[in-house]
Amino acid sequence: RVDFIISEESEMLYFLNDYSEGAHEKVLQHLIDTNMEQLSGYGTDHYCETAKKKIKKACGCEDAEVFLLTGGTQTNQIVIDTLLQPYEGVVAAQTGHVSTHEAGAIEFTGHKVLELPQKDGKICAADLQKLVERFYGDENHEHMVFPGMVYISHPTEYGTLYSRKELEELSAVCREYKMPL
């Protein structure tokens, strides 16, 4: 857990999830200011369109499709299920969000969560490499859950961040085995 000090009086905000803290005053004021606007639903209003354009621009991909979803679990479930084949699973830290906090949402889609040991909430490239080598080294691997992608929480559930080097090392293993990270 990481505490973020926001004043000299040591008042702290705890970023445990997206619903444990209140909203910033400016956010609340904007909600008040726009409360009586009549908007179309399902992400087709001008606020959503503006957000989508900003995301495309930030990604440098103006022709991308952007879908706005309501929460992290739903987003993880949809992305993981979309990226994986039916026989593939997602590799994650034992403490990773998809391993512990999604109440089985990922496995509900039919994809197993393949857990790796963690240190401070992070997985390391060497452990990932061993898992994949062990999988492909097994003569019966075609009857097992394939490691199809790697999920990391950034920051982790411990509040730690992956270094650039750690991310590059994980990415190298993922690229070698053609697994999305």
Question: What role is predicted for each listed range?
Answer:
Residues R1-E11:
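Short, Lys/Arg-enriched N-terminal segments with co-localized hydrophobic residues
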Residues E11-L31:
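Polybasic, low-complexity association/targeting segments
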Residues H24-G72, Q94-S99, A105:
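Conserved N-terminal alpha-helix of the aminotransferase class I/II PLP-enzyme fold
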